[in-house]
Structures are given as structure tokens and as C-alpha cells.
């Protein structure tokens, strides 16, 4: 991996992690395009850029990381549990799903779901929840079950949680923000596990590349969160649905 590769992958991770378009899917495609192998060193790199994306959430939502918000974080934890349990039980089977074909198909499926939800299930005027603090434990759990679909490569963790949140009555902005906060325990757990698994793969030889990826991912993720919320003030998720379908079709045509 070169420094340019590190910048490209760091930017892709930072930009896509919190959007409903699957950061994992984009990283898999980008790695294939750049000719990068899925070896231990490159896996360690992915751990670093995921960790920096987590920090972007903390910096964007410093006011949420307070003892006064314990009720909110209890709901976030409830939403985290289904994915944690299912992911742990079926970890081996999930790893076997990683392929460009699966990613492409799930891009298309996710895009169609977004279009259907936007067309038939959302009327922003009827939404009753505009702040993440107002979400109930039951709604949190339902969102958590929706997040299970993110275990399939190409589905998108953000996409599945946002769809779940929209269907239980959150506004578009509140759905996105709850997805951001839910990323903290999910990505935190995954990153901690991967760090323990790959810590021996970190060496002085690739510290510069790791550092470049870390900074790039953090800066882009920080800006991406802000731009995404601005986007949702004027637009719907229709664009993301169309993008997912087009991207998935392109993958099927050119990588199969």
C-alpha cells in the first residue's frame, strides 16, 4: 500500500461510513481497483481508519457524551445488542459472504428498499420524533433488529439503521443522528476486536501510511457527518436509493 492508496481509502472510509451506502462495500471495490490484497497489514490499516471515523462522531457530538445523557445511551446500547449477539453467533458464516457479487446484489436490494420506504412509508409531517433523546426503548430495539441486516456485506450499517428508524417514526435527521451514535458501540466493539487480533501487524515500516489514513479518514468523516445533516434539511433519501442501484448494477456488469 502506498501513501496515495492510504489517502484514497481513508477518504472513502471517512465519506461513506456514516452514509447509507456501505463503507465496507466501497472499500472492497476500491481495494480491488487498486490491486490491494486482503492481507493482515491491510486489515490493520482498515482498523485504524475505522477508529478515526469513530473519533469523528465523538467530536461532532461532544454534548451527547455526558452523564446527563445516560438514558439516551441506554437506548443506544439496547439497539446495539441484536447485532452483537447475532454477529457473534454467526461470525463464521458472515465471513463467507464477503464477495463482490454479494456486495453488488445488496447494493441494489438496499437501494430498492430506500425507494420503497421513501415513496410509501414516510410523511415527514406525521413524524413525532425529531430528537434522538425522545426515542423509546421499544423503538431502539426495533432499530437494533433492523441493523442485523448490516451483517450482510453491501447492505450498509447506516442504511439499515436509518431505514429502521424511519419506519418506527423518527424524522430523517433524527434517524441519521441515532445511526451516528449507534456507530460508536458497534464500530468501537469491532475495532477493539480487530486491534487485539491484528496488533502484531502494526510495525514502524507502515506507521506513516497508517497515520495518513487515520488523519484523512477523521477529517473526511467529520465533514461528511455535517454535510449529510445539511443535505437532509432539503432532500430525502431518494438520491441514495438511486445511487445504490446504479452502483450495484455497475459492479455486476464490470466485476463479474
Curated annotation (Swiss-Prot):
Organism the protein comes from: Sulfurimonas denitrificans (strain ATCC 33889 / DSM 1251)
MF annotations from Gene Ontology: undecaprenyl-diphosphatase activity
Reaction(s) catalysed (UniProt annotation): di-trans,octa-cis-undecaprenyl diphosphate + H2O = di-trans,octa-cis-undecaprenyl phosphate + phosphate + H(+)
UniProt keyword annotation of Membrane present: yes
Role: Catalyzes the dephosphorylation of undecaprenyl diphosphate (UPP). Confers resistance to bacitracin.
Cellular component GO terms, alphabetical: plasma membrane
Other facts: Bacitracin is thought to be involved in the inhibition of peptidoglycan synthesis by sequestering undecaprenyl diphosphate, thereby reducing the pool of lipid carrier available.
Protein family (similarity comment): Belongs to the UppP family.
Disulfide bonds: none
Subcellular location per the Swiss-Prot or TrEMBL entry: Cell inner membrane
Name this protein carries in UniProt: Undecaprenyl-diphosphatase
Membrane spanning stretches: 1-21, 39-59, 70-90, 97-117, 134-154, 176-196, 205-225, 235-255
Record keywords, A-Z: Antibiotic resistance, Cell inner membrane, Cell membrane, Cell shape, Cell wall biogenesis/degradation, Hydrolase, Membrane, Peptidoglycan synthesis, Transmembrane, Transmembrane helix
Record NCBIfam families: PRK00281.1-2, PRK00281.1-4
GO BP, sorted A to Z: cell wall organization; peptidoglycan biosynthetic process; regulation of cell shape; response to antibiotic
Bilayer topology: Multi-pass membrane protein
EC number(s) per entry: 3.6.1.27
Amino acid at each position: 500500500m502506498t501513501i496515495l492508496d492510504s489517502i484514497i481509502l481513508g477518504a472513502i472510509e471517512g465519506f461513506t461510513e456514516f452514509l447509507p451506502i456501505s463503507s465496507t462495500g466501497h472499500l472492497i471495490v476500491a481495494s480491488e481497483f487498486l490491486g490491494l490484497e486482503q492481507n493482515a497489514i491491510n486489515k490493520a490499516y482498515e482498523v485504524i481508519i475505522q477508529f478515526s471515523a469513530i473519533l469523528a462522531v465523538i467530536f461532532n457530538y461532544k454534548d451527547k457524551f455526558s452523564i446527563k445523557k445516560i438514558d439516551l445511551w441506554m437506548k443506544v446500547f439496547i439497539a446495539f445488542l441484536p447485532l452483537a449477539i447475532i454477529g457473534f453467533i454467526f461470525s463464521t458464516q458472515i465471513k463467507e459472504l464477503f464477495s463482490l457479487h454479494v456486495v453488488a446484489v445488496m447494493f441494489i436490494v438496499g437501494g430498492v428498499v430506500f425507494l420503497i420506504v421513501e415513496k410509501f412509508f414516510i410523511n415527514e409531517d406525521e413524524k413525532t420524533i425529531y430528537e434522538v433523546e425522545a426515542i423509546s426503548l421499544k423503538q431502539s430495539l426495533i432499530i437494533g433488529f433492523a441493523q442485523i441486516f448490516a451483517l450482510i456485506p453491501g447492505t450498509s450499517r447506516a442504511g439499515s439503521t436509518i431505514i429502521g428508524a424511519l419506519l418506527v417514526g423518527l424524522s430523517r435527521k433524527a434517524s441519521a443522528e441515532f445511526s451516528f451514535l449507534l456507530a460508536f458501540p458497534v464500530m468501537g466493539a469491532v475495532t477493539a476486536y480487530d486491534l487485539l487480533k491484528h496488533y502484531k501487524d502494526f510495525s514502524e515500516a507502515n506507521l506513516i501510511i497508517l497515520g495518513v489514513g487515520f488523519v484523512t479518514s477523521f477529517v473526511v468523516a467529520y465533514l461528511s457527518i455535517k454535510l449529510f445533516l445539511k443535505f437532509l434539511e432539503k432532500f430525502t433519501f431518494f438520491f441514495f436509493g438511486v445511487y445504490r442501484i446504479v452502483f450495484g448494477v455497475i459492479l455486476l456488469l464490470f466485476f463479474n
